[in-house]
Amino acid sequence: MSSLLLFNDKSRALQADIVAVQSQVVYGSVGNSIAVPAIKQNGLNVFAVPTVLLSNTPHYDTFYGGAIPDEWFSGYLRAFQERDALRQLRAVTTGYMGTASQIKILAEWLTALRKDHPDLLIMVDPVIGDIDSGIYVKPDLPEAYRQYLLPLAQGITPNIFELEILTGKNCRDLDSAIAAAKSLLSDTLKWVVITSASGNEENQEMQVVVVSADSVNVISHSRVKTDLKGTGDLFCAQLISGLLKGKALNDAVHRAGLRVLEVMRYTQQHESDELILPPLAEA
């Protein structure tokens, strides 16, 4: 192996603003397969860590792949320090996790990372399920989120169903959802963005609710009828990009929602079942 060693000057190591930890597909536009190009469109550098590697989402007639083994997953994370590639790191985001053991490994890595990066922004999308499908991850993942990742996160982006699972509270109306979100806030967890709060069905609107200790902001967007997957992953990619580019939280959430709508409509115009990113207009 030593005879193959070419790159040992750590001063030349590639650096990134964001480490994005979530699913990856060979075909399609979900997880890091949509998040990475979206983040790069925003002029930010990102390292992608896969939790599962799949041929495509399970919504096709064939489906291959599975969770990344723990040994590989922990090695991917450890390699960043071995390459000295995190000198400029500003944020870590998480999405779909393959196993509860991955969550524990990630939490241990984040805890150690915080010692060198005390201002690190950790944003967790606690992917668990939705109202239509119920829980679609392994049954031990919700508790792993509660035990390991939520205590480390500054912000989380659950949908209504995930908020109910994490808090054990009914969240089917706006007031109860806000109360549930506030119950999660702590000295570390500063904000909760509820990504699918109840909206005005008659006016074809959906609501995103931004909850912090001292404010609640309800942002309404047009509802687009579609079966497209990966919109939540895209939203989170746009949100973290906006925050790192200096946008205030409410503005970053609003802009992220608008971008998702733009991408969905662009994709529909091109008659695709997988998200297609149009060029990013200057903000």
Swiss-Prot record:
Pathway: Cofactor metabolism; pyridoxal 5'-phosphate salvage; pyridoxal 5'-phosphate from pyridoxal: step 1/1; Cofactor metabolism; pyridoxal 5'-phosphate salvage; pyridoxine 5'-phosphate from pyridoxine: step 1/1; Cofactor metabolism; pyridoxal 5'-phosphate salvage; pyridoxamine 5'-phosphate from pyridoxamine: step 1/1. ATP binds at residues 125, 157, 162, 195, 221-224, 231. Its cofactor is Mg(2+). Mg(2+) binds at residues 136, 162. InterPro entries: PdxK, PM/HMP-P_kinase-1, PyrdxlKinase, Ribokinase-like. The keyword Nucleotide-binding applies. Keywords: ATP-binding, Kinase, Magnesium, Metal-binding, Nucleotide-binding, Transferase, Zinc. One of its GO terms (cellular component) is cytosol. It is an enzyme of class 2 (transferase). Signal peptide: none annotated. Pfam families: Phos_pyr_kin. Substrate binds at residues 23, 59, 233. GO terms for molecular function: ATP binding; hydroxymethylpyrimidine kinase activity; magnesium ion binding; pyridoxal kinase activity; zinc ion binding. One of its GO terms (biological process) is pyridoxal 5'-phosphate salvage. Its EC number is 2.7.1.35. It catalyses: pyridoxal + ATP = pyridoxal 5'-phosphate + ADP + H(+); pyridoxine + ATP = pyridoxine 5'-phosphate + ADP + H(+); pyridoxamine + ATP = pyridoxamine 5'-phosphate + ADP + H(+). HAMAP family: PdxK. Belongs to the pyridoxine kinase family. PdxK subfamily. B6-vitamer kinase involved in the salvage pathway of pyridoxal 5'-phosphate (PLP). Catalyzes the phosphorylation of pyridoxine (PN), pyridoxal (PL), and pyridoxamine (PM), forming their respective 5'-phosphorylated esters, i.e. PNP, PLP and PMP. Homodimer. This is Pyridoxine/pyridoxal/pyridoxamine kinase. It comes from Shigella flexneri. The gene is pdxK.
